[in-house]
Amino acid sequence: MSMFSTGVSALNAAQQGIATTGHNIANASTPGYHRQQILQTPAIALDTGSGFIGQGVQVTTVSRQISQYLETQLLQVQAQSASVNSYLQQIQPLDNALGGTSSSTNGNFNLSTAIQGFFAGVSAAANNPTDVPSRQSLISSANAMVTEFQTLNTTFQQARVGVNTQIQDSVSQINSYATQLANLNQQIILAQAGAPPGQVPNDLLDQREQLTSQLNQQVGTSTVIQSDGTASVFFGSGQTLVIGNQAFSLQTAVDATDPQTLDVNYILGNTKVPIGANNITGGSLGGLLAFRDQTLDPAQSALGRVALGLASAFNTQHELGQDIKGNAGGQFFNIPPAVAQGNTANVGNATITTTVNNPQNLTTSDYRIDFNGTYTITRLSDNTVQASGVSAATLAGAGVDIDGLHFQLASGAATAGDSFEAQPTRGAAGSLSVASTINTSTIAVAAPITTAATLGNLGTGAISAGSVNSPNDTVAITFTGAATYNVVDTTTGATLATAQAYVSGSPISYNGWKTSISGAVAAGDVFQVSNGATSKTNGGTAAVIAPAVISVLPLNPNLQDKITVTFTSPTTFNVVDTTTATVLAAAVAYNPTTGAAITFNGWSAKITGNPATNDTFSVGPTISGTADNRNGLLLAQLEATNTMAGNTTSFEGAYAQLLNQVGNKGNELNVSAATQTQLVTQTQAAEQSISGVNLDEEAAKLMQYQQAYQAAGKYLETVSQLFASILAINP
């Protein structure tokens, strides 16, 4: 190489350095840009025999300054940060509406206040049972509470609509990024095909990595660089989004058994493959799905459980009372049955409903019902089978009781392969209302029976106020032989029957329910009835008890018959229904030390003390229009009674649990979001320290290359002058 060539190589190297530095300066603010620099190496020296003489410089490549480790770390923390922030953005409005602990207002607890206001109205009506304004105030507070339930449920529904819209938007963005990545892969293939070996299109690689970063903020992905320089992108449980110049797409679809839920499907040719939400993690889409499945659904169901539990328990007690006109209490709240959603692929026309029959056992779970000749019911919260082999006749007749719910085949018939999803609590708060029959005269504050001791009694005996037996009471049926049994209301302690004659297969009816036992019974067999649910608790026979059917109120047609209890001695008494002139019991043993619980015609009372011979006590109907408030007091007591979650908490306690669950999750996400933001900032700083453009450094390099360029020019000028001098010499 001549001296001219050496100078030109220096000039070219400086020129490329200046061009690359200018490129860096121009893209200092370009997202995803990685600083570039030229790599210079000496040209091969010339062996002159008296030593190797250098022949200038060559630029071997223009390289990107990149740490693949930091790039991977940045993608991971960005995906996690996007997921957490997406979740947080969804939960904050919900938490604010509930009045939770992570909200900026830190809680108004509107529903809790409404519940307290409702029961304050119940107490006021109970304390003034004949006061019409107090009754009207109770109705107003009931409507206010129902409105709060409905408003909160609307908030949940709006959140669900918003989540579905954002899921669709996120899927659309993912598809767009995947298509752009596939196109860039194609451009990279073409660029590298015409380039010398080892040379890469830096700017195209930057664009691809920027797109990968944007994609990763929508959904967590992993990237593998192939031998041809293309990037393959995977997500979920290994599904391919991009391979070479081919992009695969996602699609949203309405869930087959839940029209309010969007599923994400992976499109593989003409096949749609559902991707479980738990397989989609990271990015905004992962956060949206996590919010929906982990907070929105459970929280809305928890709200519905409070609404159903309160309304059902209140209805049950209200139906045991008497209104101001002497009529039996009816339903105070209207609770429409929940209809299980049939799968869109179902062939049959079966309709399955759920109603509440035991509010204390309600859960927040949904249930799947499958039919393959018989019905199987699975609780979805823990994916456990709760009932199997249930015939269509059984489901249409007695039905099935699970977790405080009564499942019933309301109409039609299923075809093998049909399935349904029951969501008994989700959305229940929105369907609650005060019954249209409730007005100031139909509120059942009074008890339907009244007890009294005859004024002329000589002993010290007394009779309790008495109460109506509830179908929710737990009752034990104990067989003393194959043809006799005793019945005890274990909730109240009252003996309902002693030595009752039994004919095999004949119905047994107490407290407003009716059941039957199939198979041979024997002494020692014990069966339990609790709110319609039945079980065998003792005994070695194969006898089976059927589910109890609760009758329409009044629970006992003889409830308000006039009853007289007459002591034939200080230790024995007779019971006579004077309305029907029927002797209900004779020579009943009485222990003055413990007293005696008596129950007939659907009521229970207790006699205590030391009655004298011929002392009498009466039980009869409460006179309409009197200031009796016993049922009102029982209704008011429901506020502080643990009637929810297996009798472990009250209505307000169950709502407080909902607040804590949402609020605690919100607080957790606030902390996590701050942490993730800090991690992103730190990782970006570390990545930029290697890949970012520092304008001060570039200015220094520009001066360096400028000086090199000028020096190379001066060198060429000197060489040119030397050659000119030589050429000017005359031979």
What does each model-found stretch correspond to?
Residues 1-731:
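S/T-rich, low-complexity, solvent-exposed segments of bacterial secretion/appendage proteins
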